[in-house]
Amino acid sequence: MTNKTSLSYKDAGVDIDAGNALVNRIKGVVKQTRRPEVMGGLGGFGALCALPQKYREPILVSGTDGVGTKLRLAMDLKRHDTIGIDLVAMCVNDLVVQGAEPLFFLDYYATGKLDVDTAASVISGIAEGCQLSGCALVGGETAEMPGMYHGEDYDVAGFCVGVVEKSEIIDGSKVQAGDALIALAASGPHSNGYSLIRKILAVSNTDPEATELESKSLADHLLAPTKIYVKSLLSLIEQVDIHAIAHLTGGGFWENIPRVLPENTQAQINESSWQWPAIFNWLQQTGNVSRHEMYRTFNCGVGMVIALPPTAVEQAIELLTAAGEKAWQIGTIATLKEGEQQVVIQ
């Protein structure tokens, strides 16, 4: 039977005018992320970007990520302004550990019903993250998909491309017994372990906005944006011989540190070298989470672990401190003995 009423895309739940309004809202913040290598602006079918001329043998490094169920917590608390920083951080931090300078970033924003204010807040956060990491936000996709997401719920994904000199790629191959390990402090749980965090909140019937921890709400602790280490690490890499860098994300200490270690080496972590930030003690105690599970799920206050020669430790910590990072020696590299794990926390 033919429908007598003329139907439009908007009747089906897709508002093209709202999408256009969003593009106009974000043009200004996107422009602030521009790099000289970027050709053209928003609106093209594809983004064009030249390689920086300073590289002799440039190798492109790419990465993609999301922010997991931290997004659900942000939506529940109606705090959308920093989730974009998280998105950029998760991508660019994975690039810089290989010595790569982030060049450009693209985002994907999908929702059941587009709320222009919410989307603009998220994308403004993405632009801020791009500025913090020195990369250009060159484009993205906003998908309004009624029936795929509940109401104004949304999901985000990020895609980043960086560049590194071929001879300066950091791949862990130089790591050897006797190397020192330096930690860089995290700003909070970053963007990992939030399904467990939300489970702990639910089981303990905790309101994160009404619960205070060290003069800040639990919500502030949990939604603190993921730290972006790009500029401080790129500066360090220029001045110090870095053997490996591990970004502590999903899988925590047990799974991320071995990703950059040769098979015959072991990372020995000195647990007494730092104190867990209060949020991790709260999570462990409230959720009755085992120590092993904490180190597997969370960063426990450590965002990056750097392997380098022991003679370079003092200089590296001085440089990182001057760059605004909190850094300390967290352990050493030893020869792996048969039957032992590649990471030991003692």
Curated annotation (Swiss-Prot):
Record's subcellular location: Cytoplasm
Task: Fetch the CDD domains from UniProt.
Answer: PurM
- Keyword annotations from UniProtKB, A to Z: ATP-binding, Cytoplasm, Ligase, Nucleotide-binding, Purine biosynthesis
Is Magnesium among the key words of this record?
no
One GO CC annotation, please?
Answer: cytosol
Per the record, what are the reactions this protein catalyses?
A: 2-formamido-N(1)-(5-O-phospho-beta-D-ribosyl)acetamidine + ATP = 5-amino-1-(5-phospho-beta-D-ribosyl)imidazole + ADP + phosphate + H(+)
Q: What is its main location?
A: cytoplasm
Q: Which SUPFAM superfamilies match?
A: PurM C-terminal domain-like, PurM N-terminal domain-like
Sample GO molecular function, one term: ATP binding
A Pfam family the protein falls into: AIRS
Concerning its family, UniProt says: Belongs to the AIR synthase family.
User: What protein does this entry describe?
Assistant: Phosphoribosylformylglycinamidine cyclo-ligase
The gene for this chain is: purM
